[in-house]
């Protein structure tokens, strides 16, 4: 069904003004969802200047040229790690094609920008722009739904990335923009418009582990099966209930996503024990926490402390390292999430993907499926012996994103494997 877009009709004007360019919601005419395939800045299109892009090279270098959850390189990396275990999709010996960059843009108004100063609640993130789209084009386009504070084009090392951001003066303009322009044609490209989110703080600031000195001066609590939405601050706030928290950490992967476990350090043993008694087995956002004493806590000649150690070790057998504990539990979590899930379900938010390369990691799932929409969870389905099956289950927050995932990624060649994707069903 066509959306009423006012002046943005299907008739293309000779004017280069963006308000006269074609803009419709005819999804059947959707061109290939590749930021660089149809317009690579050749001689037929003039290059335009990125006037003052707020996400400049400084931003891209700080975050590895990638923007967090909603801004993955698209299409997903084709290199893939093959079933033989080659890590070619990361640029190794798999022969996978690298990401094609847009044309180099000039910066006549380049300036430094602190991303934390922007009002993300009033901002949108726009994907699949043509490489000659400018901030002025975005401002004029989205100015039809609300007053625009600023519009920007995202670049990487001087190259147009086919993405941009728009900040409005009012929050309600965000939903108006998404409703009106998500999926609409603009400059012959189908736009993908989403709520903008702040970039994660530097991973080293969040994921660095507590030093041995910090642990020696306190009592560590290790928490497994944390909701993936929980960061160190919310973890700290939660565990304040049991005492003064010296430090809280959530373990992140190389993409800056939570790995589902973390730690809290208290100054006293009593606070540590109270936290274990309070939170172990508690359900938070549908996940049951497993809370235990940290491995490196000091042993003290204290009957109560030693008894507590014995009780804990009785419940978990021999004491493995933190990484081993976490890995085992992550496998258990994946098994529970994917248990009884099969392909061929009715329309729902869960996606069943088979024929993945056996060496695909969980973080790869976010790279592959994340650009489509917000993911609640994604897990690889293991065999009973823990070996990979090449199957994953992905839960999207929105049904429309699940629909779009099947439309765009079914039969997609990933790491030399043709993915088979359908709605999931739980038997």
Curated annotation (Swiss-Prot):
It is found in: Cytoplasm; Nucleus; Chromosome, Telomere; Cytoplasm, P-body. Disulfide bonds: none annotated. The modification Phosphoserine is found at residue 24. Keywords: Chromosome, Cytoplasm, DNA-binding, Nucleus, Phosphoprotein, Repeat, RNA-binding, Telomere. Transmembrane segments: none annotated. Its main location: cytoplasm. Coiled coil: none annotated. Present with 2540 molecules/cell in log phase SD medium. This is Serine/arginine (SR)-type shuttling mRNA binding protein GBP2. It comes from Saccharomyces cerevisiae (strain ATCC 204508 / S288c) (Baker's yeast).
């Amino acid at each position: 069904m066509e959306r009423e877009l006012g002046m943005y009709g299907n008739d293309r004007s000779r004017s280069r003004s963006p308000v006269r360019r074609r803009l419709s919601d005819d999804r059947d005419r959707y061109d290939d969802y590749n930021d660089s395939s149809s317009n690579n800045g050749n001689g037929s299109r003039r290059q335009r200047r990125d006037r003052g892009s707020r996400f400049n090279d400084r931003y891209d270098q700080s975050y590895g040229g990638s923007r967090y959850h909603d801004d993955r390189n698209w299409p997903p990396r084709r290199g893939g790690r093959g079933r033989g275990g080659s890590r070619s999709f990361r640029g190794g010996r798999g022969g996978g094609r690298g990401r094609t960059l847009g044309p180099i843009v000039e910066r006549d108004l380049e300036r430094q920008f602190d991303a934390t100063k922007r009002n993300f609640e009033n901002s949108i993130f726009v994907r699949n722009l043509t490489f000659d789209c400018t901030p002025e084009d975005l401002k004029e386009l989205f100015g039809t739904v609300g007053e625009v504070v600023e519009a920007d084009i995202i670049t990487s090392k001087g190259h147009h990335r086919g993405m941009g951001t728009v900040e409005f003066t009012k929050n309600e303009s965000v939903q108006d923009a998404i409703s009106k322009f998500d999926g609409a044609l603009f400059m012959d490209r189908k736009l993908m418009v989403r709520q903008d989110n702040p970039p994660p703080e530097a991973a080293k600031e969040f994921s660095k582990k507590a030093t041995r000195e910090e642990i020696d001066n306190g009592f560590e609590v290790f928490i497994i099966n944390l909701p993936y939405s929980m960061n160190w601050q919310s973890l700290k706030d939660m565990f304040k209930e049991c005492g003064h928290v010296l430090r809280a950490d959530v373990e992140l992967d190389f993409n800056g996503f939570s790995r589902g476990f973390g730690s809290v350090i208290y100054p006293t043993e009593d606070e540590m024990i109270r936290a274990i008694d309070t939170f172990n087995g508690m359900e938070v956002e549908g996940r049951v926490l497993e809370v235990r004493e940290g491995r490196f806590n000091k042993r003290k000649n204290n009957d109560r402390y030693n008894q507590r150690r014995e009780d804990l070790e009785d419940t978990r057998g021999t004491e493995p390292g933190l990484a081993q504990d976490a890995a085992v539990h992550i496998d258990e979590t994946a098994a529970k999430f994917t248990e009884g899930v099969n392909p061929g379900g009715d329309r729902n938010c869960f996606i069943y993907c088979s024929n993945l390369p056996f060496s695909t990691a969980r973080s790869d799932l976010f790279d592959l499926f994340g650009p489509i929409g917000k993911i609640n969870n994604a897990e690889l389905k293991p065999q009973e012996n823990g070996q990979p099956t090449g199957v994953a289950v992905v839960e999207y927050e929105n049904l429309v994103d699940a629909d779009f995932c099947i439309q765009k990624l079914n039969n997609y060649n990933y790491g030399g494997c043709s993915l088979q994707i359908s709605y999931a069903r739980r038997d």
